[in-house]
Amino acid sequence: VPSGLPKYHVVLWDFGAKQNILRKLHSLDCELTVVPAGTSAEEILKLNPDGIMLSNGPGDPKDNPEIIAELAKLCQSQIPIFGICLGHQLMALANGANTIKMKYGHRGANQPVKNVETGSIYITSQNHGYTVDSDSLPASAKVSYINMNDGTCEGITYQNFPGFSVQFHP
């Protein structure tokens, strides 16, 4: 790739993205196309992205049935998809899993999570009151990170398409 040209074209589906996410993607030589929450799967696919990123955002993920339906279509496209926070929850719902309201949400920059494959533990920043119900995941999805305080799902890897997501803010 010639110097100065972006390596990847990433569509950021914006549900309330933090500016630091955009800065980080730019620093990784990504050409970004930011699209609003109401964008259809067809419109996103017309942009011909190398990858799709689902941003963080507020609220109950189940309040977004139109987004969930469009995301289910994107998951069949075989384009890599990465979700953060609300994006993580929406991707789980789009693949048949369930989300539940937590008794005590995860708030702050001191939430320990464990990579279930490597055993590595990371201190993460989180701000959410809903979690993906691990027991509801389809066979094609595997929990990749868990919260060390309460054992809730903090990450998922999908085996039927190139998708992965995390509940925390990387």
Q: What are these language model-derived features?
A:
Residues V1-N48, P61:
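RNA-binding accessory domains that recognize and position tRNA/RNA substrates
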Residues G4-V10, T118-I121, Y158-G163:
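Beta-strand-turn-beta hairpins that frame and shape the catalytic cleft
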Residues H9-D14, T124-S125, F164-F168:
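Active-site-proximal beta-strand elements of phosphoester/diester hydrolases
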Residues W13, V35, M102, I146, ...:
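Hydrophobic residues at beta-strand termini and immediately following loops
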Residues K46, D50-G51, S55-T131:
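Cysteine-nucleophile active-site neighborhood
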